[in-house]
Amino acid sequence: MSDWVNVAPQDEFAPGEWRSLDVDGTRLAVFNVGGNYRAIEDVCTHDGGILTGGSVEGDEVVCPRHGARFSLITGAALTPPAYEDVATFAVRVEGGLVQVRDNRWD
């Protein structure tokens, strides 16, 4: 995926909300953290489960199963039991739409 993909209209994506979507076989999670949009791969590197549904505390998401924390800015695994980072993705607002892009393969 190297093109921008629409996630949601900005006016329907309030602070504190998240969206999960599948783009070209990759499950992404996009978070609105106080008006700043962050996107990571929606998978806990500890056990492969999804991160959406876990709590968001500042710029971190907490895995709902075992409590591993990941940075929504860098994707870094911050606490055990996860030790591997998750991928992050570029996010922008264009024409009133929140969009995400994966440039890992450009």
List each language-model region with its residue ranges:
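N-terminal pre-ligand scaffold of iron-sulfur
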Residues: M1-G58, S71-L72, A76, D85-D106
